[in-house]
């Protein structure tokens, strides 16, 4: 193979990153995306069928000799300008056809193809024409968490989300819930970067072409659970969870339960104090969201026990929020307790954090995951008719682990399975495409993780196959 600098080297040497790379690449090519297809075949499936035969050698080279992100870029460029034109551009750059494959297998590929063919930057992500489309006007949303506390991180994220085809972003602030019941129960938002940066972030998202839902996101302060306690909190053993909460509260003298959707007060005075404190926390966010021009506001997240027990207090609070924020409102109910909530008529959307269990089987098939969505969404459709409100999946997502379909809310430090995460996304989007009464979804989570993304077991989708799946559905069709 003749390299661009004129050197001629054995083909294997042209791609080698380290002495063990070629055997590892062969194993990667032979590996399977869950129980579906070899990795290379999965990538080729993102291209229109007519282009697959001519694209196969180049894409397999890209996959074998670099990482999955480079292969995604190559697939995007090939779909944008067509394989013959792409290879012609690379031949012109590299000098010969065999070198075109070398260059296609590098980060240079997408930029060089666009430069030589005049394709726009960024290139649209390839659409799978055989798939059904999302309903017209569907809110193609992604959740972005302000944990980094930097507006420049938001700007870069919003531009990339727009390039993937997203139309909405849910900006999650990050605020700590105080340890005790002395006022204020909630930290003052103006002391936290989540509040200080909100206006700039909303404007950055708008500049990128995205609409914005502001979603205050509370976390606990003064208590850091162990890994075992986290497992119990997120698990399905309700007796173990109740025992753990009781034990921690006894140690801390705390009257509010630790889980947001399990909040309980000791007496009426504590309830009044809780609502006064929460109102003083959330109203500044509503005012700031209005001033920044945000398009939607979420009045609360996964505090369902308070909504069920104190509906009148929540209705009064919603009225106060409407006086500050003039756009549509929703509340984000948890997937396992939303049916007990009756105040949807006071809001504009039924909002659900949709971490529904879809399948108990390890590595479930696409059909099994879709069947899980059929079961989960049937009660929501009935509620939408009964309350006369459309539904938003205010959160939906899956960790990159083998149990993603069984417990989508739970993250574990285990071997990553990014292909099951992508399959869960595909099943979710197929389910949403058939349900026009669902007006949108905000997928959790757009957050950069420590590289390589291929080994990250979290919910984050940056540089993972799930982001490519999302872009196939969100992008131009």
Where are the regions a protein language model picked out?
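Conserved hydrophobic register position within alpha-solenoid helical repeats
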Residues: 1, 10-11, 40-43, 74, ...
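Amphipathic alpha-helical scaffolding segments comprising HEAT/armadillo-like alpha-solenoid repeats
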Residues: 15-29, 49-64, 83-95, 118-125
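Short inter-helical turns and helix N-cap capping residues of alpha-solenoid HEAT/ARM repeat scaffolds
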Residues: 32-33, 66-67, 98-99
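Boundary/entry segment of secreted carbohydrate-active catalytic domains
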Residues: 124-161
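Aromatic-rich peripheral "rim/lid" segments of glycoside hydrolase catalytic domains that contact
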Residues: 124-132, 237, 244, 408-410, ...
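Substrate-binding cleft and catalytic face of glycoside hydrolase catalytic domains
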Residues: 164-183, 197-307, 401-403, 444-449
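Glycoside hydrolase catalytic-domain groove-lining segments
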Residues: 194-195, 200, 215, 328-330, ...
């Amino acid at each position: 193979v003749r390299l661009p600098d004129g050197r001629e080297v054995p083909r294997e040497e042209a791609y080698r990153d380290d002495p063990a790379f070629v055997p590892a690449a062969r194993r990667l090519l032979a590996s399977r995306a869950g129980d579906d297809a070899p990795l290379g075949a999965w990538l080729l499936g993102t291209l229109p069928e007519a282009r697959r035969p001519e694209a196969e050698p180049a894409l397999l080279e890209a996959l074998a000799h670099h990482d999955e992100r480079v292969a995604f870029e190559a697939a995007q460029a090939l779909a944008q300008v067509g394989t013959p034109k792409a290879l012609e551009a690379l031949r012109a750059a590299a000098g010969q056809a065999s070198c075109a494959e070398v260059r296609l297998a590098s980060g240079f590929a997408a930029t060089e193809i666009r430069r030589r063919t005049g394709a726009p930057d960024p290139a649209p992500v390839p659409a799978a024409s055989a798939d059904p489309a999302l309903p017209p006007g569907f809110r193609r949303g992604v959740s972005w968490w302000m944990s980094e506390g930097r507006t420049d991180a938001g700007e870069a994220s919003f531009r990339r989300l727009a390039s993937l085809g997203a139309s909405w972003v849910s900006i999650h602030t990050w605020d700590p819930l105080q340890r005790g019941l002395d006022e204020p129960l909630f930290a003052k938002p103006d002391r936290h970067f989540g509040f200080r940066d909100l206006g700039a972030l909303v404007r950055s998202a708008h500049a990128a072409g995205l609409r914005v839902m502001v979603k205050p996101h509370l976390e606990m302060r003064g208590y850091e659970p162990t890994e075992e306690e986290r497992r119990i909190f997120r698990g399905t053993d309700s007796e173990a969870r109740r025992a753990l909460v009781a034990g921690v509260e006894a140690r801390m003298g705390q009257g509010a339960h630790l889980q947001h959707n399990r909040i309980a007060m000791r007496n009426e005075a504590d309830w009044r104090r809780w609502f006064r404190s929460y109102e003083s926390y959330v109203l500044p966010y509503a005012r700031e969201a209005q001033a920044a021009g945000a398009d939607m506001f979420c009045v609360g997240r996964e505090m369902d026990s308070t909504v069920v027990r104190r509906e009148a207090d929540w209705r009064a609070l919603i009225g106060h929020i409407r006086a500050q924020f003039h756009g549509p409102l929703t509340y984000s109910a948890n997937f396992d307790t939303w049916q007990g909530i009756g105040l949807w008529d006071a809001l504009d959307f039924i909002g659900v954090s949709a971490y529904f269990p879809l399948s108990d089987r390890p590595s479930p098939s696409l059909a099994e995951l879709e069947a899980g969505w059929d079961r989960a969404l049937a009660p929501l459709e009935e509620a939408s008719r009964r309350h006369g409100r459309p539904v938003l999946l205010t959160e939906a997502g899956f960790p990159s682990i083998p149990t993603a379909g069984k417990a989508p809310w739970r993250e574990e430090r285990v071997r990553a399975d990014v292909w099951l995460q992508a399959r869960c996304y595909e099943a979710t989007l197929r389910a949403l495409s058939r349900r026009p009464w669902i007006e949108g979804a905000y997928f959790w989570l757009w957050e950069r993780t420590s590289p390589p993304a291929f080994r990250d077991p979290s919910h984050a989708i940056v540089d993972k196959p799930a982001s490519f799946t999302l872009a196939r559905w969100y992008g131009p069709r």
